[in-house]
Every structure is written in structure tokens, then in C-alpha cells.
């Protein structure tokens, strides 16, 4: 559901479309930097989700995240972005976060899985 105009608008759009659950991006899915969530927007989002009975709401993590990348810089950046996604989901009272954990690219599947698992325990 589109979050144009802010996250609370997505809840209103979901209810108008007769949806009783919702998946949103809490930030741009194609940029590393995320705008801060204003307290008023958080409060309105939580209030509308409850009031309009649009629950559960789930976030979808950024497509840039790649916890399996052999590139250390990308992997660190991905870990930080995932942490931010989880923090935003908690702040908004969301049920969870959908994540595509990434691709092992030029290495083996086993090496990529080892990096993902290692990152999950950080």
C-alpha cells in the first residue's frame, strides 16, 4: 500500500480498500538513508491502525539489504539498515518485517549462508 503522504495515509487507504491487514515500507526501499519518523506520525499511525482495525501491519525491509554479500562494506551497511528497519517496526508497533536476506553473488551458496548466519548472531 502506498505511503505517499505519510504512513497513516497507508492505513486509511487499506481500510478504504476493505483490507484488514497491511504491509508497508517504513522508508524508501531503494535508498540507504531513511527520513526520521516524526512522533506525531508514529502516534497517528498507531491510533489509526487500532481505530480502523487494520491489523496486523507488517513492514517490508529495503531491497538494498544483502547480509550474504562477500563485500564487507555492503554487509555492514546491510546490518545497520536491518537494525534500523527493526527499530522502526518496533516503534510503529508492527508485527514483523519481511526480509529478503540477500545473494551470495560471486561466492558459493555455502559461503553466503555462513555470512547470513554469522550476521544473524551479531
PLM region spans:
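N-terminal pre-domain/capping segments
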Residues: 1-61, 65, 69-86
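Active-site acidic/histidine proton-transfer and metal-coordination neighborhood
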Residues: 67-119
